Design a protein with these regions (language model features):
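Residues that form or immediately flank small-molecule/cofactor binding pockets and catalytic motifs
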Residues: 24, 57-59, 127
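Alpha-helical support elements that line or immediately flank enzyme active sites
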Residues: 1-24, 28-48, 104-117, 144-178
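Glycine-rich loop/linker segments at domain edges
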Residues: 70-159
């Protein structure tokens, strides 16, 4: 991925670019975006007309690469007395860091909306989302689960559990009666 992106930006044939990296497992998350260090080393190599070796240690990596999860979720659920879910309203605040590293800041909200309560038959849903930019490393990196499914599922099940408890219902029965059929 990096080689193809570099070839495109540098207007060089892909076969003229060599990126050497040890086997670090997978190709997801922090390994996907093009970070400033990559760009600087590539430009230096082009300007100097010789190979440039860029080395990053673990602390530098943690400071400069992205993070995925700094999210606050709040919501409410409309219920009938018998436990049928009538609707949900969700608000999220997401810290995107200094910039959103995957160039698609709507991905978080779309993924959250598609994931939250997907297993349940809910006739009405409303989501508001606010992304903020802070002085942290870049945000928006997907790892351990894409499109914010992890946060959405945790949030969904906590709301379902709280709703069942508020109604004095068995949680398993509450879930069964509201599953998509």
């Amino acid at each position: 991925i990096i080689r193809a992106a570099v070839a495109l930006v540098a207007e060089l044939p892909e076969h003229m670019i060599r990126i050497i990296s040890p086997d670090i497992g997978g190709g997801f998350g922090n390994k996907v975006p093009v970070y400033p260090g990559y760009v600087c080393s590539i430009l230096a190599s082009i300007l100097l007309e010789r190979p440039v070796k860029w080395i990053e240690d673990k602390s530098g990596n943690l400071i400069s690469t992205g993070f995925a999860r700094d999210v606050y979720l709040d919501g409410e659920m409309a219920l009938r007395r018998d436990g049928k879910i009538l609707g949900v309203r969700i608000h999220t605040d997401a810290d995107h860091g200094a910039f959103f590293s995957d160039a698609q800041p709507s991905k978080f909200k779309i993924g959250l909306m598609h994931s939250a309560f997907a297993a349940y038959d809910i006739p009405a849903a409303h989501l508001t989302a606010r992304g903020t930019y802070t002085n942290k490393a870049p945000g928006g990196v997907a790892y351990r689960c894409s499109f914010r499914v992890t946060e959405a599922m945790f949030f969904q099940e906590r709301m379902v559990q709280a709703a069942a408890d508020d109604l004095g219902m068995d949680q398993a029965e509450f879930r069964r009666m509201n599953f998509v059929r």
